[in-house]
A protein has these predicted regions:
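A short, Lys/Arg-rich alpha-helix, primarily the initiator
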Residues: 1-33, 104-122
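Charged, helix-prone or intrinsically disordered regulatory segments positioned adjacent to compact structured domains
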Residues: 86-101
């Protein structure tokens, strides 16, 4: 069986940049302030807030998104929106769990959406 790792659809990162920039505008914060408050490097925050179909390998980590959420003091609903935007595969995982999908069925949905698979073989 061939190993297949799909490229993650980069569109979500454009949406993530818009979302975080919106939170910054609401608070009248600069990306530099977000970097300070979140403990992330200015370069990391810049990659996230200035993303325009750039390097597809630049995906923020779960820890980075959590640090941003804490720094911005987001509500529960805002945190969910942030994480769902940063990690669109989470929505598929949630649906799969709720609907009782198998790993193969879940991988089929992830594959169709250009998201990372649960397994390395396809």
């Amino acid at each position: 069986m061939a190993i297949y790792l799909p490229k993650q659809n980069p569109d979500y990162r454009v949406e993530l940049a818009k979302l975080i920039n919106g939170y910054l505008a609401e608070r009248e914060w600069s990306p530099a302030r977000l970097a300070r408050e979140s403990g992330q490097s200015k370069a990391t925050i810049s990659r996230i807030t200035n993303y325009k179909n750039g390097n597809p390998k630049n995906q923020p980590s779960l820890r980075t998104i959590q640090a941003i959420a804490l720094a911005l003091k987001l509500s529960r609903e805002q945190r969910k929106e942030l994480f769902d935007t940063a990690f669109p595969e989470f929505r598929v995982w949630e649906e799969a769990a709720e609907q009782g999908y198998t790993v193969d069925e879940t991988n089929d949905i992830l594959y169709e959406k250009g998201l990372p698979l649960l397994t390395t073989e396809r």
